[in-house]
Amino acid sequence: SLGATYEGRQTGTFGDIAAISFNGNKIITGSCGGALLTNSKKAADRVRKWSTQAREDAAWYQHEELGYNYRMSNVVAGVVRGQLPYLEEHMAQKRAIYERYREGLRGLPVTMNPYEAAKAEPNFWLSCLLIDEKAMCPQERGDLEARYEGQSGKSCPTEIIEALARYNAEARPIWKPMHLQPFFRDKAFISAGPGEDVGADIFRRGLCLPSDNKLTADRQERIMEIVRACFA
């Protein structure tokens, strides 16, 4: 959420510690790595030590606790610093993509990722949609594969993903919840109470649309034509 604000505050300023990713698909990218934000010198010093394999201040390699090799290379850091002045420009490009989707998909039984404009200003990093329940065609997902049964006037994330892939455009489901991952399925977790599993429902009906800031209006219109055709 780099660049996004909530009630006038940058999202990275909430809490004692915040983390920012510079992965290859982020709004500012170094292809990998990230940053930790804190006003605590104690926390910052601790993390710096851990990131250099927890090496002690000695002439030899001295390790008294477990550390990690999480240092960012100078090359990656330079790439990130070189992009930072363009953050506002990237956000404007992302917002234009979001607004074109919202206008171009108007009339379909979908909802674009919402935000509370009176309180929040997103960075519009990723444009997503949620298909109305009544407009979902049958869809089944295993751990690695998915299938669907097409129905007139209805669609599902799997159908749209496959249709866009034929145009060489990548779309993906919204993130699979941690408690549904095979590694965690047999682990205990705390829920908000009985009722609908909101995360699982969003994963089932949600879709991340192509959102690269270099996406042209013409190509985006073709993507929207494909999405509209899935609901025909």
Which ranges hold each PLM region?
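Short beta-strand-to-turn element immediately C-terminal to the catalytic PLP-Schiff-base lysine
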Residues: 20-21, 34-40, 81
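PLP-dependent aminotransferase class I/II
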Residues: 5, 41-232
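Glycine-rich phosphate-binding loop of ATP-grasp-fold ATP-dependent ligases
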Residues: 27, 31-35
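Conserved PLP phosphate-binding loop immediately N-terminal to the Schiff-base lysine helix
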Residues: 1-21
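Alpha-helix termination/capping residues and helix-transition junctions
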Residues: 11-12, 28, 69
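Acidic, glycine-centered active-site loop in nucleotide-sugar glycosyltransferases
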Residues: 14-15, 32, 127
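Hydrophobic/aromatic residue at the end of a short beta strand that borders the catalytic acidic motif
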Residues: 2, 29, 215
